[in-house]
């Protein structure tokens, strides 16, 4: 089983659909709206959320496989009830699965902002809204954060020279 992950490069998604390679596509969306996404995803300004999801739908139609939407949850940034409702509206008619990923602290983000992980209760509430809206949502288990070895943390340690 092969999975290809992308930040949502629309021409690349369309190329995968045309090539009909049997794989699972994961799209790192992280926000249901363009303003929030462009603030937290460096390439977020290049492709609009609507265009990314349209490409994901084209991929699903061509491949006959659901697309995974990756959504790293950042406290006070992309974890509100309103954002959950908007994401549910955008995905309700699709078979896409949403993987909710708790943020692993790695230092300041691309904008210099320091992000925090939402509480477990906030994450549960977000998932409940998605589920009530007809969207399949799963929590991605995180491991290694107690030793700064979880997703993203090793890269930050190497990049900054921290030991």
Where are the regions that the model predicts?
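Conserved AdoMet/S-adenosylmethionine-binding subsite of the radical SAM
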Residues: 1-133
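C-terminal interaction modules of eukaryotic adaptor/scaffold proteins
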Residues: 136
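Radical SAM enzyme core and accessory elements
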Residues: 132, 142-163
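A structural preference for short, hydrophobic beta-strand core positions in alpha/beta folds
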Residues: 100, 139-141
């Amino acid at each position: 089983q092969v999975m290809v992950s992308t930040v949502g490069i629309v021409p690349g998604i369309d190329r995968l659909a045309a090539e009909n390679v049997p794989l699972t596509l994961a799209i790192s969306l992280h926000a249901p709206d363009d303003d929030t996404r462009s603030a937290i995803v460096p390439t977020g300004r290049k492709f609009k959320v609507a265009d990314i999801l349209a490409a994901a739908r084209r991929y699903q139609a061509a491949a006959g496989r659901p697309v995974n939407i990756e959504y790293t949850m950042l406290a006070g940034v992309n974890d509100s009830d309103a954002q959950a409702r908007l994401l549910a509206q955008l995905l309700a008619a699709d078979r896409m699965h949403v993987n909710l990923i708790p943020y692993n602290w790695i230092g300041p983000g691309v904008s210099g902002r320091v992000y925090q992980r939402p509480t477990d209760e906030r994450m549960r509430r977000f998932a409940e809204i998605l589920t009530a809206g007809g969207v399949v949502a799963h929590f991605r288990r995180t491991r290694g954060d107690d030793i700064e070895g979880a997703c993203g943390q090793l890269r930050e340690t190497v990049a900054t020279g921290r030991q």
